[in-house]
Curated annotation (Swiss-Prot):
Name of this chain's protein: 60 kDa heat shock protein, mitochondrial
Keyword Isomerase: yes
Designated gene of the protein: HSPD1
Modified sites of kind N6-acetyllysine: 75, 82, 87, 91, 125, 130, 133, 156, 191, 202, 205, 218, 236, 249-250, 269, 292, 314, 352, 359, 389, 396, 469, 481
Protein's cellular compartments: Mitochondrion matrix
Organism of provenance: Homo sapiens
Length: 573
């Protein structure tokens, strides 16, 4: 009989054979100094070259293979950056760090990702070069950040607020690669729903772009039964000046809604019932009365699920001046309904797919209070899904929703255009937030003289400031290069011209950028520079890079299979 220690001694080697990953992780590959930096820089260059071709009005598109469906055609910098994954792990680390720059800029400003990428490449490249000659990377980073702070302060001085719809259209047009139609449609949308209104972008069903304004509270639930239809045209139910009964619970008994029907009848008003569901006896009686005596009523399921449904019903109650029955903490019963418990709306339109409550008669102060509550929730939530739902609710309570429907002849065309529309929309919002500066890379060029007055603490910090001076020329040079002209000559000529003169790459001429409407949002330029400098200067301080060496998989069990086959053969003979 074996003792326990002997058994354990026999088991230990077995566990190592069966589960090597439990005892040891992947092996690592380590590179130091110039070797590591050179490989990372190759990755940075590859990504930046791919992104840079999209810059400016004469920038080209990039075609990206997708794991499913047609290839994606895009001129959006962040989409190109995200698609790049390099085989060499050291090159990939460099590429991924610059990819982060594009992502951060996109999340914060919604545009300017190409500018951020070319700026990051320039700072990293120059930084690596100086470090190889013995400069101190930490002091270079300090010099870079010192210069960036000075540039941002100068950008704020140059910035002008956006005041007219024309300026909004100009910002959107530039960001949409010179497409005036997109610029005008975004300007119209902002005019109609307000500068802080919700604007969403969707695939259209036609060849042309369309703008749909949804005012009031629209939600994606239609009538429960088609027998509620009261218009022959359009298969919908329409009422003017109606009462609204809101319930969190299912309504099955007709007795529970008779009091509400009597109130509506006494006041000669139609009744809209919005509940978790209306079924059984309640639904059949409503339909029967609708058909026999022309009862003006429609039943609709409440939108959303769980907490989202509760919140939307509460929003409807506040917007219409009613109450929600079945709400936790309230002792309201449907049988005890009073006229002041019913919401009031000027117009109701219900189709088989959606319902719209227009001109709600809710108390303005209560609506404003509810809007503030939603804004506060927006500030603290981190979930993208939650933010989307809160924004939708906010729009329904405030100025309504503008839907931009992007048209085109194929999915590929619509998707490419949708990228540009989204960029243009983000740029426009950024411009409204922080104002505008000269476009075409000119704003950064006009900041170069401000760096002359800086006093660095040492020579290495001075090198960092010089790196930023040269980097600020890169966006204008890239735009010129993509237009087929010599970038350095264009930059020199802009620097010698008056403050508002820049290069119009589309026309191939030097023009007054403000008069021509070639402008950029201050927030986009500021964010692009700040994100690029932060990541790229940190990249230059790296001395060691550690990557994993993937474990080579051995052929699983082919030998055993062969043995098994032999055994079977032997058994059969």
């Amino acid at each position: 009989m074996l003792r326990l220690p002997t058994v354990f001694r026999q088991m230990r080697p077995v566990s190592r054979v069966l589960a090597p990953h439990l005892t040891r992780a992947y092996a690592k590959d380590v590179k130091f100094g110039a070797d590591a930096r050179a490989l990372m820089l190759q990755g940075v260059d590859l990504l930046a070259d791919a992104v840079a071709v999209t810059m400016g009005p004469k920038g080209r598109t990039v075609i990206i293979e997708q794991s499913w469906g047609s290839p994606k055609v895009t001129k959006d910098g962040v989409t190109v950056a995200k698609s790049i994954d390099l085989k060499d792990k050291y090159k990939n680390i460099g590429a991924k760090l610059v990819q982060d720059v594009a992502n951060n800029t996109n999340e914060e400003a919604g545009d300017g990702t190409t500018t951020a990428t070319v700026l990051a490449r320039s700072i990293a490249k120059e930084g690596f070069e100086k470090i190889s000659k013995g400069a101190n990377p930490v002091e270079i980073r300090r010099g870079v950040m010192l210069a960036v702070d000075a540039v941002i302060a100068e950008l704020k001085k140059q910035s002008k607020p956006v005041t007219t719809p024309e300026e909004i259209a100009q910002v959107a047009t530039i960001s949409a690669n010179g497409d005036k139609e997109i610029g005008n449609i975004i300007s119209d949308a902002m005019k109609k729903v307000g500068r802080k209104g919700v604007i969403t972008v969707k695939d259209g069903k036609t060849l042309n772009d369309e703008l749909e304004i949804i005012e009031g509270m629209k939600f994606d639930r239609g009538y429960i039964s088609p027998y509620f239809i009261n218009t022959s045209k359009g298969q919908k139910c329409e009422f003017q000046d109606a009462y609204v009964l809101l319930s969190e619970k299912k309504i099955s008994s007709i007795q529970s809604i008779v009091p509400a029907l009597e109130i509506a009848n006494a006041h000669r008003k139609p009744l809209v019932i919005i509940a978790e569901d209306v079924d059984g006896e309640a639904l059949s009686t409503l339909v029967l009365n609708r058909l026999k005596v022309g009862l003006q009523v429609v039943a609709v399921k409440a939108p959303g699920f769980g907490d989202n449904r509760k919140n939307q019903l509460k929003d409807m109650a506040i917007a219409t001046g009613g109450a929600v029955f079945g709400e936790e903490g309230l002792t309201l019963n449907l049988e005890d309904v009073q006229p002041h418990d019913l919401g009031k709306v000027g117009e109701v339109i219900v189709t088989k797919d959606d319902a719209m409550l227009l001109k709600g008669k809710g108390d303005k102060a209560q609506i404003e209070k509810r809007i503030q509550e939603i804004i506060e929730q927006l500030d603290v939530t981190t979930s993208e899904y939650e933010k989307e739902k809160l924004n939708e609710r906010l729009a329904k309570l405030s100025d309504g929703v503008a839907v931009l429907k992007v048209g085109g002849t194929s999915d590929v065309e619509v998707n490419e255009k949708k990228d540009r529309v989204t960029d243009a929309l983000n740029a426009t919002r950024a411009a409204v937030e922080e104002g505008i500066v000269l476009g075409g890379g000119c704003a950064l060029l006009r900041c170069i003289p401000a760096l002359d007055s800086l006093t660095p603490a040492n020579e290495d910090q001075k090198i960092g400031i010089e790196i930023i001076k040269r980097t600020l020329k890169i966006p204008a040079m890239t735009i010129a290069k993509n237009a087929g002209v010599e970038g350095s000559l264009i930059v020199e000529k802009i620097m010698q011209s008056s403050s508002e003169v820049g290069y119009d790459a589309m026309a191939g001429d030097f023009v007054n950028m403000v008069e021509k409407g070639i402008i950029d949002p201050t927030k986009v330029v500021r964010t692009a520079l700040l994100d690029a400098a932060g990541v790229a200067s940190l990249l230059t301080t790296a001395e060691v890079v550690v990557t994993e060496i993937p474990k080579e998989e051995k052929d699983p069990g082919m030998g055993a299979m062969g043995g098994m086959g032999g055994g079977m053969g032997g058994g059969m003979f």
